[in-house]
């Protein structure tokens, strides 16, 4: 397999962690970074991370880029993606991680700039034109002839979808309500301030448990159409830096038991969803999952059963690191299918 050449647009939390997740992969070469922040600051933020620790690579700065273990990655600062030098840099795929260009029109500017494909590291605002693909759930639907732009959805959808898939495949999921207890993110202020769309979201992140909306549960239907109209959810933002947890309360079509649900999750975690869905029956807490690469880790000791058709299950996820690893996995699965189609 020829090396996949990747550009990153937006070197924030996810952009940097995608690079960390892929930098030592022999099948990936990062060829460019676009961010309005100067290269020396980008290199500093890549090297030192308060949550995930120091990068175990040598990181240096040049005027026009950063050097990681001797490999030079050019950095540019261009506001309009259509003007980026992806063609000149040889970028095959671009990870769109600014959070700004999440529809077809915005993301397609990277194609105009010379990239072959775009992976949006966020839910798309244009689901009818941009396919949502989740590794382990529906990534095999990638069509090299049509899918020039794809979305990797959100970290929460990546956590919920494998759980929902196992439940639905084995017992039938008739309806469900999800709550994600979600770590702080960069959109939240450190102290109280105005927030135009969501007043509660403007309150100090480190001081409060903040109820919030999320489209993550409904978005599961984009990758599991059979669950359309059966799931919705909400979020609580909590004062922790990383690792979140999904709580799904649901009804099943088939009468079953919590023990049988746990058995189905364990089987999937060791089989069809190995590496995507994890399983634990230990007495764990959130920090135990920091640095975990799974999309979702089912917690057998945390779920409950009301009756043979009504249950609650709990699944953990490192909302930064797990998600960033899925972006890398998605790119590699896409290019592999692309190369097979070309033979």
UniProtKB/Swiss-Prot annotation:
UniProt-annotated site: Activates thiol group during catalysis, residues: 182
Broad enzyme group: oxidoreductase
Pathway participation: Carbohydrate degradation; glycolysis; pyruvate from D-glyceraldehyde 3-phosphate: step 1/5
Keywords on record: Cytoplasm, Glycolysis, NAD, Nucleotide-binding, Oxidoreductase
Any Gene Ontology biological process: glucose metabolic process
Note: No significant Gap1 activity is detected in cells under different growth conditions. Gap3 is certainly the main GAPDH present in cells.
PANTHER family: GLYCERALDEHYDE 3-PHOSPHATE DEHYDROGENASE (PTHR10836), GLYCERALDEHYDE-3-PHOSPHATE DEHYDROGENASE-RELATED (PTHR10836:SF76)
The name this protein goes by in its record: Glyceraldehyde-3-phosphate dehydrogenase 1
Gene that this polypeptide is encoded by: gap1
């Amino acid at each position: 397999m020829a090396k996949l050449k990747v550009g990153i647009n937006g070197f924030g939390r996810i952009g940097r962690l995608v690079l960390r997740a892929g930098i030592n992969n022999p099948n990936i070469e990062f060829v460019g970074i676009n961010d309005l922040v100067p290269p020396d600051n980008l290199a500093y933020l890549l090297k030192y991370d308060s949550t995930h620790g120091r990068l175990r690579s040598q990181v240096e700065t040049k005027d026009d880029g950063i050097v990681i273990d001797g490999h030079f990655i050019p950095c540019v600062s261009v506001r309009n993606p259509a003007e980026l030098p992806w063609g000149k840099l040889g970028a095959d795929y671009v990870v769109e991680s600014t959070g700004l260009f999440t529809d077809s029109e915005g993301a397609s500017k990277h194609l105009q700039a010379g990239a072959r494909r775009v992976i949006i590291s966020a839910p798309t605002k244009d689901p009818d034109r941009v396919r949502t693909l989740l590794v382990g759930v529906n990534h095999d639907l990638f069509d090299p002839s049509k899918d020039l732009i794809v979305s990797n959805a959100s970290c929460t959808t990546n956590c919920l979808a494998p759980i929902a898939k196992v439940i639905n495949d084995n017992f039938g999921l008739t309806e469900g309500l999800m709550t994600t207890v979600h770590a702080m993110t960069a959109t939240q202020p450190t102290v109280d301030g105005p927030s135009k769309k969501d007043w509660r979201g403007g309150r100090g992140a480190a001081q409060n448990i903040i109820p919030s909306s999320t489209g993550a549960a409904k978005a599961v239907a984009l990758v599991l159409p059979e669950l359309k109209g059966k799931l919705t959810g909400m979020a609580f933002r909590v004062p922790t830096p990383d690792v979140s947890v999904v709580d799904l309360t649901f009804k099943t079509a088939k009468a079953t038991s919590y023990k049988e649900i746990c058995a189905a999750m364990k089987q999937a975690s060791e089989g069809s969803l190995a590496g995507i869905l994890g399983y634990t029956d230990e007495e764990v807490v959130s920090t135990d999952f920091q640095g975990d690469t799974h999309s979702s880790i089912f917690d057998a000791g945390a779920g409950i059963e009301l009756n043979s058709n009504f249950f609650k299950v709990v699944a953990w996820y490192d909302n930064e690191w797990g998600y960033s690893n899925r972006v890398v996995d998605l790119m590699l699965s896409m290019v592999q299918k692309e190369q097979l189609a070309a033979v």
